[in-house]
Amino acid sequence: MKNLLLITIAAVLLVGCQTETTTTFDIDRARTHIDKQNAKYMEFFNNGDASGVADLHVDEAIVMPPHTGLIKGKEAIKQAISDEISAGATDIVFTTLDMYGNEDYVTEVGRFSLNIKDNGKIVMNDSGKYIVLWKQVSKDNWLMKADIWNSDLPIKK
């Protein structure tokens, strides 16, 4: 009987000590804020502001463009974006296809298009796909942690 009483008390204590974890994460709310960040990226990029684009990344961010090595950190990202802009890249547009994650990280899958201009004349159109890992650094403030993309254009032989 003593054992039954001890087991009953232990069970009551265990049940009483359990805390239910419920998440209040709202992917639609996150998407609203990430969409705003994407709009800023497009505005900065299309206006030649590599610093503005770099500021949309966390300090330790990595960027993985096609046909080149890994780019680490905001300063290196700023330089890479500046090089792209100097090469004539402009008119970038992002289209989000999917977004999923949690309160800490969200993965965005999408498509992009851009133009390459020389003396104001379009000399090439490019389009492709991307994946971005967004990190929530404070309430409703999402910055890029990792970014990888590639072009749909065939490699010239």
Question: What are these regions, as identified by a protein language model?
Answer:
Residues 38, 57, 84, 108, ...:
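Polar/charged side chains located within well-ordered beta-strands of beta-rich proteins
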Residues 4-14:
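Sec-dependent N-terminal signal peptides
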Residues 110-116:
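Generic short beta-strand segments
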Residues 17-51, 55-56, 156-157:
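Short, low-complexity N-terminal intrinsically disordered segments enriched in polar/charged residues
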Residues 99-106, 135-141:
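A short, structured loop/turn motif at beta-sheet edges
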Residues 119-121:
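Outer-membrane beta-barrel domain signature
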Residues 127-153:
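Short beta-strand edge/turn micro-motifs at domain boundaries
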Residues 29-33, 50-102, 111, 124-125:
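A solvent-exposed, acidic/Ser-Thr-rich amphipathic alpha-helical stretch
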